[in-house]
Amino acid sequence: MTKALEGIRVLDMTHVQSGPSATQLLAWLGADVVKLEAPTGDITRGQLRDLPDVDSLYFTMLNCNKRSITLNTKTERGKEILTELIRRSDVMVENFGPGAVDRMGFTWDRIRDINPRIVYASIKGFGDGPYTDFKAYEVVAQAMGGSMSTTGFEDGPPLATGAQIGDSGTGIHAVAGILAALYQRENTGRGQRVNVAMQHAVLNLCRVKLRDQQRLAHGPLAEYPNDDFGDEVPRSGNASGGGQPGWAVKCAPGGPNDYVYVIVQPVGWKPLSELIGRPELADDPEWATPEARLPQLTKMFQLIEEWSATLPKWEVLEKLNAHNIPCGPILSTKEIVEDASLVANEMVVTVPHPERGEFVTVGSPLKLSDSPVDVTSSPLLGEHNAEVYVGELGLGDEELRLLKSNGVI
């Protein structure tokens, strides 16, 4: 069976997370992703190692289904080889610091002269302006994209989210831009530049908070449990801030992740009041309608928690779902790795590795009926040098040996 992106060749000049997450997704969709690394390798190969002298999980979990070649692009011969790789590629992706690829001698004008059909994607921290040259990391993007100021509790400091919305979130946005550019190329015959900034991607994921910033001009946000409102959207703990109020309520026996997130819809109030042993609240004018409950959300969830705290979260989940009440248990990372349904859906997969033996990673969240994903191991450093340089670029075995001895690869 062919893959969705079969025949698309991606020159992957990315490192760390924002770029590799994008190119891994392209590889899962069937593209031939050739990861170009300096002879010393992507820095994450050696970061946060759990085992000595093997590629770290940080690297392996972001670089599955790729091939790896090494190249010193600072050498003249390295630049010549890079030129040929660009000429043969459909997509080029990089996430170096601003201007780094230009300083190599490969401006966008030169790249499109080499290959007018190439889609050239760049991931940076920020767009054009005063922040352009700032260094960006995951939490920096969260800080400057609206996430941290709105995450946490009202009386606490700004908090980072555990989800990598600045890195992997940006990678997903980059993939959308790349696919759109490839599709447009079918009509125009030419490639184009795709620019994605981490700050912009985080902001896109925080759009509901900008919605609420504008709503503040008309008064307090009733859907928030906060006592006070200024002229900025406040942090509101676990409140959804949407039309259907929600909160994480404690469950037995009281461990750090013994919680269930419960959403109270209008239709769910009657069965919920019966479940918690307060059936009279279904008809009580002070509780019966969403409008009546809105000013006392904190008290409402306290009543629910008095019930949920006596039961394990899986029993709470079962009872709530029996009445079609939206809810979800807070799953720890250990529970996620062991979740049978996630394994069955190939979202948690075990991958063989030539040096590690095997490792557990996240599978593709995109399920295409005609392009199934088989997650394969990340490549060893330079594993495909001979395959690409000799087999595809036509270099001789002796030249390959000289390139290695001269530090070009």
Curated annotation (Swiss-Prot):
<dbReference type="InterPro" id="IPR003673">
    <property type="entry name" value="CoA-Trfase_fam_III"/>
</dbReference>
<feature type="binding site">
    <location>
        <begin position="17"/>
        <end position="18"/>
    </location>
    <ligand>
        <name>CoA</name>
    </ligand>
</feature>
<dbReference type="Pfam" id="PF02515">
    <property type="entry name" value="CoA_transf_3"/>
</dbReference>
<dbReference type="InterPro" id="IPR050483">
    <property type="entry name" value="CoA-transferase_III_domain"/>
</dbReference>
<dbReference type="GO" id="GO:0033608">
    <property type="term" value="F:formyl-CoA transferase activity"/>
</dbReference>
<feature type="region of interest" description="Disordered">
    <location>
        <begin position="221"/>
        <end position="245"/>
    </location>
</feature>
<comment type="function">
    <text>Involved in the catabolism of oxalate and in the adapatation to low pH via the induction of the oxalate-dependent acid tolerance response (ATR). Catalyzes the transfer of the CoA moiety from formyl-CoA to oxalate.</text>
</comment>
<dbReference type="InterPro" id="IPR044855">
    <property type="entry name" value="CoA-Trfase_III_dom3_sf"/>
</dbReference>
<protein>
    <recommendedName>
        <fullName>Formyl-CoA:oxalate CoA-transferase</fullName>
        <ecNumber>2.8.3.16</ecNumber>
    </recommendedName>
</protein>
<feature type="binding site">
    <location>
        <begin position="95"/>
        <end position="97"/>
    </location>
    <ligand>
        <name>CoA</name>
    </ligand>
</feature>
<keyword id="KW-0808">Transferase</keyword>
<comment type="pathway">
    <text>Metabolic intermediate degradation; oxalate degradation; CO(2) and formate from oxalate: step 1/2.</text>
</comment>
<feature type="active site" description="Nucleophile">
    <location>
        <position position="167"/>
    </location>
</feature>
<dbReference type="InterPro" id="IPR017659">
    <property type="entry name" value="Formyl_CoA_transfer"/>
</dbReference>
<feature type="binding site">
    <location>
        <position position="103"/>
    </location>
    <ligand>
        <name>CoA</name>
    </ligand>
</feature>
<dbReference type="GO" id="GO:0033611">
    <property type="term" value="P:oxalate catabolic process"/>
</dbReference>
<dbReference type="InterPro" id="IPR023606">
    <property type="entry name" value="CoA-Trfase_III_dom_1_sf"/>
</dbReference>
<comment type="subunit">
    <text>Homodimer.</text>
</comment>
<comment type="similarity">
    <text>Belongs to the CoA-transferase III family. Frc subfamily.</text>
</comment>
<feature type="binding site">
    <location>
        <begin position="242"/>
        <end position="244"/>
    </location>
    <ligand>
        <name>substrate</name>
    </ligand>
</feature>
<feature type="binding site">
    <location>
        <begin position="71"/>
        <end position="74"/>
    </location>
    <ligand>
        <name>CoA</name>
    </ligand>
</feature>
<feature type="binding site">
    <location>
        <begin position="135"/>
        <end position="138"/>
    </location>
    <ligand>
        <name>CoA</name>
    </ligand>
</feature>
